[in-house]
């Protein structure tokens, strides 16, 4: 029987609350995280503690960010000094302030599906502070995050996150693993920020570019997915010599690799185009 009441708490739709109850899935997630005693582990949206409990079996303490005031008080009573509870909205939270020298900052959570994309983009601002992130998300979102060019799932989210993270689709989670069950399948993703070299540049497969410019270019490219780029990127003709760059405008947006979008954003942002090999 479906119910929105679990452990005496009524799941609140406006907070996107679906509580994880499958012990096998919980074990799989904690094993994937593999928390170490010196880690600073921060959980977003701990809910009723389905992940918090097994994480604290391996950690002396951890921190959580929770918006639901009823759950905030419940968590504080239950865990006491072992759990630092930050009451507030993760979309406005400064995760960088939790960083400590010599300790890995790691962020985990079963993210509310109704704010997952904005929250992922908010966390990009703290990628330099974080060792890794493990999140439960709608399966469709995870597939978009890790998608390759040419697939239906490939889009703005794929490009903007792949530029900053190495990502892995870790495991799938069926609706029956939650109470109340969501109407969609879920999945767990691992996100590891590309590290920086001593000079501050990212050690990633992609050249450095302005994230704002890249976002504008990619948003324009995908604004009309069924049309070729000659239509959606025509406004850049005064800034970019597409022929000299070797950028084929007869393609659709989903056919263009991340590296080509990055190079296009670099040129729009003022970088010199690369020399073409004859």
UniProtKB/Swiss-Prot annotation:
Protein EC: 2.1.1.182
Described purpose of this protein according to its UniProt entry: Specifically dimethylates two adjacent adenosines (A1518 and A1519) in the loop of a conserved hairpin near the 3'-end of 16S rRNA in the 30S particle. May play a critical role in biogenesis of 30S subunits.
Upper lineage: Bacteria, Pseudomonadati, Pseudomonadota, Betaproteobacteria, Burkholderiales
Enzyme class, UniProt record, top EC level: transferase
Stated name of the protein: Ribosomal RNA small subunit methyltransferase A
UniProt organism field: Cupriavidus metallidurans (strain ATCC 43123 / DSM 2839 / NBRC 102507 / CH34)
Family from the record: Belongs to the class I-like SAM-binding methyltransferase superfamily. rRNA adenine N(6)-methyltransferase family. RsmA subfamily.
UniProt keywords, alphabetically: Cytoplasm, Methyltransferase, RNA-binding, rRNA processing, S-adenosyl-L-methionine, Transferase
UniProt entry tagged with the keyword rRNA processing: yes
Record-level Gene Ontology MF annotations: 16S rRNA (adenine(1518)-N(6)/adenine(1519)-N(6))-dimethyltransferase activity; RNA binding
Originating gene: rsmA
Alphabetized InterPro entries for the sequence: KsgA/Erm, rRNA_Ade_diMease-like_C, rRNA_Ade_Mease_Trfase_CS, rRNA_Ade_methylase_Trfase_N, rRNA_adenine_dimethylase, SAM-dependent_MTases_sf
GO CC term, one of those recorded: cytosol
Disulfide bonds: none
UniProt-listed SMART domains: rADc
Origin: domain of life: Bacteria
Pfam families linked: RrnaAD (PF00398)
Reactions this protein catalyses: adenosine(1518)/adenosine(1519) in 16S rRNA + 4 S-adenosyl-L-methionine = N(6)-dimethyladenosine(1518)/N(6)-dimethyladenosine(1519) in 16S rRNA + 4 S-adenosyl-L-homocysteine + 4 H(+)
Coiled-coil residues: none
Residues reported in the UniProt entry to bind S-adenosyl-L-methionine: 18, 20, 45, 66, 89, 110
Localization per Swiss-Prot or TrEMBL: Cytoplasm
């Amino acid at each position: 029987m479906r119910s929105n009441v679990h452990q005496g708490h009524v799941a609140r739709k406006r907070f996107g609350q679906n509580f994880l109850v499958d012990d096998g899935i919980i074990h799989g997630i904690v094993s994937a995280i593999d928390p170490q005693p010196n880690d600073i582990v921060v959980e977003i949206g701990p809910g009723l503690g389905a992940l918090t409990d097994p994480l604290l079996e391996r950690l002396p303490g951890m921190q959580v960010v929770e918006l639901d005031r009823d759950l905030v008080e419940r968590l504080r009573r239950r865990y006491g000094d072992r759990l630092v509870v930050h009451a507030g909205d993760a979309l406005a939270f400064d995760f960088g302030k939790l960083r400590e020298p010599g300790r890995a900052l790691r962020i985990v959570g079963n993210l509310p599906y109704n704010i997952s994309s904005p929250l992922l983009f908010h966390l990009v601002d703290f990628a330099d502070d974080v060792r890794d992130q493990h999140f439960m998300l709608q399966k469709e979102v995870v597939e978009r995050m890790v998608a390759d060019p040419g697939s239906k799932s490939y889009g703005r989210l794929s490009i903007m996150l792949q530029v900053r993270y190495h990502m892995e689709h870790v495991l799938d989670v069926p609706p029956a693993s939650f109470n109340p069950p969501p109407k969609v399948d879920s999945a767990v993703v691992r996100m590891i920020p590309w590290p920086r070299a001593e000079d501050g540049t990212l050690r990633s497969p992609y050249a450095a570019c302005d994230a704002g410019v890249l976002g504008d270019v990619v948003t324009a490219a995908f604004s009309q997915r069924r049309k070729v780029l000659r239509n959606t990127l025509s406004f850049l003709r005064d800034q970019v010599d597409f022929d000299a760059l070797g950028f084929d405008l007869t393609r659709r947006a989903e056919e263009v690799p991340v590296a080509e979008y990055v190079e296009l954003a670099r040129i729009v942002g003022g970088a010199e185009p690369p020399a073409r090999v004859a």
